[in-house]
């Protein structure tokens, strides 16, 4: 008979959120249930209820986790780009991948469809903090390009494949447009442009 290691509250929450992220990427947002996450980490449904209160609570925490980790990655790419060690395309690809491959777009749309709009607050706050941390909040051009980049990435994650196919455009068309937009915004703001 094996004895399970007792996890701290923070360790349990972290394990659950990481399992939820894996389920999101593998199977989509509908798979992120308390039962599925509990099964994946070897805990009980009641244990997860204790930590998150509901599936919506777990999804909100997952959204916060994704937003914080993704924004940290994007911030590093922006800073590298400004230092001449990265490109606008790096920022675009990370943002688009966050909404597509990392499941951010699917999770956001799933939460909206299910009436859980407040669960998107961590995403919106993390993006705002990212812009603020990068010292761009005072610049209207950069705020607008951040908004456009995020909306383009979200739209591409949800409809990009079928829409580019229908319009007979290359699959990366939205990414190309976003890159051109970021380069133009950087030039307008007097920021260095690499690549």
Region annotations inferred by a language model:
Residues 1-11, 194-195:
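N-terminal intrinsically disordered/low-complexity leader segments
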Residues 15, 19-57, 61:
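Helix-turn-helix
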Residues 15, 19-27, 72-80, 107, ...:
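Solvent-exposed, amphipathic alpha-helical segments
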Residues 55, 62, 66, 70, ...:
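Hydrophobic/aromatic residues within well-ordered alpha-helical segments
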Residues 61, 72-105, 139-140, 146:
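Hydrophobic alpha-helical connector segments
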Residues 89-137:
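Short secondary-structure transition hinges
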Residues 117-128, 134-195:
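Hydrophobic/aromatic-rich alpha-helical bundle segments in the mid-to-C-terminal region
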């Amino acid at each position: 008979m094996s004895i399970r290691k007792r996890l701290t509250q923070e360790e349990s929450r972290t394990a659950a959120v990481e399992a939820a992220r894996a389920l999101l990427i593998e199977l989509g947002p509908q798979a992120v249930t308390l039962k599925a996450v509990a099964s994946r980490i070897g805990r009980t449904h009641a244990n997860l209820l204790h930590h998150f209160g509901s599936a919506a609570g777990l999804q909100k925490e997952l959204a916060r986790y994704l937003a914080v980790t993704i924004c940290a990655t994007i911030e590093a790419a922006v800073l590298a780009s400004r230092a001449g060690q990265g490109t606008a395309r790096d920022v675009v690809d990370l943002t688009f991948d966050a909404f597509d491959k990392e499941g951010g777009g699917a999770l956001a749309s799933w939460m909206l469809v299910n009436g859980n709009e407040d669960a998107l607050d961590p995403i919106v706050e993390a993006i705002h903090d990212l812009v603020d941390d990068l010292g761009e909040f005072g610049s209207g051009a950069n705020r607008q390009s951040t908004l456009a980049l995020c909306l383009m990435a979200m739209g591409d994650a949800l409809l990009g494949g079928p829409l580019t196919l229908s319009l007979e455009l290359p699959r990366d068309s939205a990414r190309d447009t976003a890159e051109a937009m970021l380069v133009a915004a950087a030039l307008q703001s007097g920021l260095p442009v690499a690549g």
